[in-house]
Amino acid sequence: MEHAKLTKNLKLKIKNAQLTKAAGLDKLKQKLAQAGSSDTKNSPVSKAQTKEKSSKKTAGTTASAPEIESGATESTARRIRAKDRSSFAAEEPSTTVALPGDASHLTLDALPSADSTEPLSNSSQEKIVEDAVETPNSPQEDGKELQEEVANEQPARNEETPIIRTRTEPKSVVSIKPKFGPTGKHINHLLAKTFKAPAKETKAAAPAEETTQQTRPSVETASTKQQQPSGTNTRPAQSAPAYRRESTNNNNNSKRGPDRDRTKRSDENVKAFTGRDRYGLNEGSSEEDKWRKKRVHKTKKQSEEHVVQCPSHIKIALPITVKDLAAEMKLKASELIQKLFIHGMTYVVNDVLDSQTVVQYIGLEFGCTIEIDSSEKEKLCLVENTVRDEINETNPQKLVIRSPIVAFMGHVDHGKTTLIDALRQSNMAASEAGAITQHMGAFKCSTPVGEITVLDTPGHEAFSAMRARGAEVCDIVVLVVAGDEGIKEQTVEAIEHAKAANITIVVAINKCDKPNFNEETVYRQLAELNLLPEAWGGSIATINTSAKTGEGLQDLLEMLALQAEVLELKADPSARARGLVIESELHKGLGAVATVLVQNGTLHLGEALVFNDCYGKIKTMHNEHNQLLQSASPSTPVLITGLSAIPKAGDPFIVVKNEKVAKEIISARLAGQQRSAALQKKRPNFDAVLQNKKTLKLIIKADVQGSIEALAHSILNIRSEKVDVEILSSGVGDISESDIRLASASKATVIGFHTSVESHAESLIKSLNVKVCLFDIIYHAVDAIKEIMTGLLDPIAEEKNLGAAEIKATFKSSQLGTIYGCLVTEGTMVRNQKVRIIRDKEVLWKCSLSSLKRLKEDVKEVKKGMECGILLDNYQQAQIGDTLQCYEVIYHPQKL
């Protein structure tokens, strides 16, 4: 039986050996055996220890064949198990166990034949392979085997003892794990510390293989250490895990995660973080802070006061602002303002200084001489002298006699235009609105004594500017005085204009055909004005005339010719033309046209000329008879076209080289005017705001520029302490849509003088509800504007007493309230009038008398001495004995 078992076990061993050889495990055994022998030779372990350990190792094998076979299988399995482990793990002491001698000396001859043995199935082969390649034993099983080997120690056999190589590990360094709080950080890490400079890494990191091999612990060794009983010396003491040693020894060189992996620092190194550290005031206080990046503190450079010296001499052009003057003088504007304020002048930086005296005085205060630069002004001003000065400076050989310019002046309705019509044999007076002249006319008429240029001026008080302009341009003034009325206000004004211009005066006493004509009255009035007539031994020529009968007209012409001969009126026709604008207007077909009077030189067709703020190139030139002219000699009035804009009446003109030069001059002038207008903006009138003045806003449109001037002058002369007049816009031509829209936006009134409304603007007037007033006579326009100004004022309320009644009894009514039984003591109580409730001579309330009854009948009024029932509107607190005064409110319009 035993022999059969042995045979079976032997067969299994042989089969396993064949499988091992087939799998190539025999070569692995040889390599392991050679490695073990080399380690045994190099190891310093003593032979006694080797024998003792080998005896302990072989004690577990039994003498019987099955036990030897199991031991061989076990050793083989261990060698295979060592291969399965990671090659990067720490090596264990390897042991080599030799097979028993009986098994090693077996040969294939002793094996049974193939025929006698039954073939193994696949399942049996798989089972045998599983037995041969066993899984490693658990640590508990290894421990039990070691205990059994120690207990059943047997003497060593004569077999070759295996050599065991052991590895002594250094003692592990015990590291104390710091305790962390709920935040996951140590308490010392939460305190403010001074930071140290990070250590520079000089050594490169170890390869991943070495790190893994060193740090990976032996699971089997650790588990064996836990199961090994204390007091046994069978195995050397195990050291601490590799990863703990690594973290303990190389803590400074290894990179860790958050602060909790850092080593605990001593309290001596902990430094409180203060506000000085935040602002970098503790820099360099310790060596640890040397690594910190020093803040670059910008050192405050002491501002050196650069004493800028004011220049001793500058050259400026006027007007100039305070700011610009300070810049030119290299000073602060505040210094100039302070100096001006000290001398009683209040200015701000944007105010304009246009006085040469003020500018130069301020310069002297700072030690600077200021010179006024007038080069630009000289460039824009083509000529400096007047026409008369230019004629006086001209070579006498070039001068020729010219026609006299005669201006007819006088009071309104004294017959100036009628007298001119009689001289010209025309009928201009019939076409004038209101039978008064409202435009200035200039024309040349031929008389038996020669040609005379006549200027017809308006006589109304509104046209004083026209009269002044006529007095400046004319040579002789014919003062027309009505013999039946004498000298009036505008006559006196005309005399003053003539005296101011030092012009010869000839007095024409008109309307000599009337029965109440009295020339002596006119002589006396002239003498009172220091104009002594020739009849009284003076030098003033007086002529009695009648425009209707023609009496005295020839004498008047002869007198004018005599005066012109005495004056020796001459001009230079070869010079460039200079003159004055008599009137200008906007023609629908021709555009801007102007009536000009040539005073010196000759004006030719196609020449370029410059006015104050516009220029032009003459396209057409007509006389008063609408005849086309090629040239105009001195003392000739002509109507010219081709202007860039409408010139103002009274503007002088002069001929320039070409249109390009004229355009450049006007562009420079307009730029200067715009700059001056921007600098000299009117400050808001705070007095009007404080006085709560009302303002009438107007937009004026007229047929000619002179009419606008006259109307604006008349409107602005309306004096009122309660209403101010502001002219928003004025222009020549018909009233357009833009004028209506501007009036609607600004709540203004449109005034049209001798003009009309464009057809497409009439519907806009109704839709926007704009007030438009059209006039043909100037004094009608002025009167209408006064009425509009008066309508802006709130009427004055006046209370007029009507009667009084005393309350004798009171009656309560649930529907009507309190009814007062009264006795009328004075006057009349009238229904629906105002009532005062008076008690102890004090007015308690004012209300309306809503109901008045007499004997249960509604009456309109109750007279004195009668009783009545009165119901007051919204008042129920009157008592017996109170007095009810009835009154009415009368509104009176205010006066300007």
UniProtKB/Swiss-Prot annotation:
Residues 510-513 are annotated as: G4. Residues 32-306 are annotated as: Disordered. PROSITE patterns: G_TR_2. Pfam families: EF-G_D2, GTP_EFTU, GTP_EFTU_D2, IF-2, IF2_N. Residues 546-548 are annotated as: G5. Residues 156-170, 256-280 have a biased composition (Basic and acidic residues). GTP binds at residues 410-417, 456-460, 510-513. Gene3D superfamilies: P-loop containing nucleotide triphosphate hydrolases, Translation factors, Translation initiation factor IF- 2, domain 3. Residues 35-48, 114-126, 213-237 have a biased composition (Polar residues). Keywords: Cytoplasm, GTP-binding, Initiation factor, Nucleotide-binding, Protein biosynthesis. One of its GO terms (cellular component) is cytosol. It is found in: Cytoplasm. SUPFAM superfamilies: Initiation factor IF2/eIF5b, domain 3 (SSF52156), P-loop containing nucleoside triphosphate hydrolases (SSF52540), Translation proteins (SSF50447). Residues 401-570 form the tr-type G domain. It comes from the Bacteria. GO terms for molecular function: GTP binding; GTPase activity; translation initiation factor activity. Residues 410-417 are annotated as: G1. One of the essential components for the initiation of protein synthesis. Protects formylmethionyl-tRNA from spontaneous hydrolysis and promotes its binding to the 30S ribosomal subunits. Also involved in the hydrolysis of GTP during the formation of the 70S ribosomal complex. Belongs to the TRAFAC class translation factor GTPase superfamily. Classic translation factor GTPase family. IF-2 subfamily. This is Translation initiation factor IF-2. It comes from Chlamydia muridarum (strain MoPn / Nigg).
